[in-house]
Amino acid sequence: VGPYFLSFAGDRRRVAYAPSLAHTNCRPENFDEQLVSELLSRFDFLSVREEETVPLFQTLVDAPIDVVLDPTLLLDSDDYADMASKDVLQGEYIFMYLLRECPELIESTVAMTEATGMKVAYISDKNLDIPNSINLFGVGPEEFVSLIAHASLILTNSFHATVFSVLFHRPFRVYATDKSGARMRDLLSNIGLSDRCVDVMCADDIAPCEWSDVDSRLDSLREHSCAYLRKALS
């Protein structure tokens, strides 16, 4: 595990920016506490992405552990404008992106396309049983960002699909109810969008969002994260 903790850096300054456990079922009994404590103690600055992971690691080090934004959120939609300029699909569509299997998300997608009449675009290594849908292949970062930027609705259990939905002010719903959803729950809570995290949904759930408030909160979090970097790198 040494390289993951920058063991190759010698006596140089070590800065951890927004590392993520992704899953919150990590417990001290699942790793060598003494080893991790020794490795973390070599860092000059420590931060994490999820609030829920701070108590876990704070027991291992005396240094403060900050909570900062995912690097993709340090930029705004203008910075991603070129990536989003490519039109992948024409007309209105629902973009459904599964990072992990989620039958509830697929069921809700089927219900939404039947209720709205909009087609569904999704990315998967297998065809899903969703009417009026298209499985997109060969989708790279630019196409991914563009699909979100131009979608009428995004349904996902992916953190980064959530990030770009927020940045581009798109209607979205997130399925983040399991242990792997801590990053999404933290982000949505911090920007006042916890109600976008759902178990099931229907067409009536697509309520408008007060994006000015979201942007204001995100700007504050962005400034906090940049201040952490400025301090760590100065």
Where are these regions (language model features)?
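Active-site anion-handling motifs in enzyme catalytic cores
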Residues: 1-234
